[in-house]
């Protein structure tokens, strides 16, 4: 469905620079790019580029290379899922509220620009110190600033690396069990995953859990019991960071050279996902499900959980000119723009827009843990053996989030609905991220034994 926009915003089509005619397929675009995108998707067209897949797309040359034009449509954020498959006029109605929300945010941003000169793509923060000398086994790519997070030493963490000590992820599990088997299955298959660490997770048993968990949260009045329990399940961020850094500092076997920046990012994402799997295994309801249901749920939402983890880290980071990695290092947006390539750069900027939306909504930690729980128990899942238990978990989480927002943010009566709309954008972002990863995989650019690619392949089989 198309939506009008306000003329005073002076928007130009992000694909070709022509005058915008309205909201089309998730974005303000011109009429020409709207029609081109719709025809391409509905007719399942496949284009090729006769040049180097980097043709300039503007108002005068937009018809010259349909391949690069369509890639630019996807890069700037036009959404495949918004195009109707039945060839009827109008997009999918479910995107209407998101368009209206986006329009309101653009109006708000326009007012901010007029009042404060605020822009998303600001330069690096003033006074950022130069990066310190990197540790010997973990070279920092150019453009990364190694900060000193609280509780994280500059060198490798003291003591054994424990469950995440191996730099290369163990993939020696039966393919029939899927890529998560080594991280989910306890010693005896067919049992639900216990909250304790299973035997395959670490060869020598170690005393105590690998992560420190905070003291029970005293939320005071108006904090539902479910949210209190979820807060207690959140791992200590400093210990997670130290464990991931320690893993990255260990050189991979057979690869004495320093890894490329993209390979490092993939390993960071792998280790972050392993910590997310551990969190899921400790969650109420999830640990009561059969292993098959647990794997189905995680295979459905793994990319959304990773994206949402990144988004919340940026909200805590609070700097528009850089992004914060899970290792505590800062990457300037100017570095991303110069070195990351157009697809990854567009992903980062789209994520930054969502960071701004959630920051404007004043997302707090209580809402974050509840939304993460909702993502884990997404009802957009088929072939579950215990669908009723998952449905009950989602209903309880929805009720807890609604009660919390009404109690603590009474001045923003629709905050609950706005937060759920943001989850739609998280899913769209995760879909674009998976397409990017698979594109890199087809180009043989992904590191070996990458868990994320195995997750992608498991989803397709």
Swiss-Prot record:
May be regulated by phosphorylation and dephosphorylation. The modification N6-acetyllysine is found at residues 34, 38, 72. Residues 222-459 form the NR LBD domain. Its main location: nucleus. One of its GO terms (biological process) is positive regulation of male gonad development. Residues 116-158 are annotated as: Disordered. The modification Phosphoserine is found at residue 203. It is found in: Nucleus. A 1,2-diacyl-sn-glycero-3-phosphocholine binds at residues 341, 436, 440. Residues 10-85 bind DNA. Residues 126-138 have a biased composition (Pro residues). A zinc finger (NR C4-type) spans 13-33, 49-73. Adrenal, ovary, testis, placenta, adipocyte, and brain. The keyword Transcription applies. InterPro entries: NHR-like_dom_sf, NR5-like, Nucl_hrmn_rcpt_lig-bd, Nuclear_hrmn_rcpt, Znf_hrmn_rcpt, Znf_NHR/GATA. Residues 230-461 are annotated as: Important for dimerization. GO terms for cellular component: cytosol; nucleoplasm; nucleus; RNA polymerase II transcription regulator complex. PANTHER family: NUCLEAR RECEPTOR SUBFAMILY 5 GROUP A, STEROIDOGENIC FACTOR 1. Belongs to the nuclear hormone receptor family. NR5 subfamily. Binds DNA as a monomer. Part of a complex consisting of SFPQ, NONO and NR5A1. Interacts with NR0B2. Interacts with DGKQ and CDK7. Binds to and activated by HIPK3. Transcriptional activator. Seems to be essential for sexual differentiation and formation of the primary steroidogenic tissues. Binds to the Ad4 site found in the promoter region of steroidogenic P450 genes such as CYP11A, CYP11B and CYP21B. Also regulates the AMH/Muellerian inhibiting substance gene as well as the AHCH and STAR genes. 5'-YCAAGGYC-3' and 5'-RRAGGTCA-3' are the consensus sequences for the recognition by NR5A1. The SFPQ-NONO-NR5A1 complex binds to the CYP17 promoter and regulates basal and cAMP-dependent transcriptional activity. This is Steroidogenic factor 1. It comes from Bos taurus.
